[in-house]
Regions:
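Long, contiguous binding/interaction regions
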Residues: 1-86
Length: 86
């Protein structure tokens, strides 16, 4: 059963982790519904909300991979209702 979720990512060292972060996001492109990157002018922090549609295991795996990046802070909000995909 699919759920909608918002994965909020803060990259505290975006210059060091952005390539790996983007590679991980690319691997999960099929579940990604939206993405917005907000870099701060001095480049010290990037805020990235990711809107996804997937089963809970996939959401948790995706979030866990991002969370392993050095300087990454990740939170998720998952809709309690299943998404009707038909």
């Amino acid at each position: 059963m699919k759920r909608a979720a918002i994965i909020s990512v803060i990259l505290e060292k975006p210059q060091e982790s952005k390539k790996t972060f983007n590679n991980i996001v690319s691997e999960y492109h099929e579940i990604l519904r939206g993405r917005m990157g907000i870099p701060f002018r001095n480049g010290s922090v990037a805020l990235i909300p990711l809107i996804v549609e997937a089963d809970l295991d996939t959401i948790n795996t995706f979030m866990g991979r991002i969370g392993k990046l050095e300087g990454a802070i990740v939170t998720v909000s998952i809709a309690s209702l299943n998404i009707d995909t038909e």
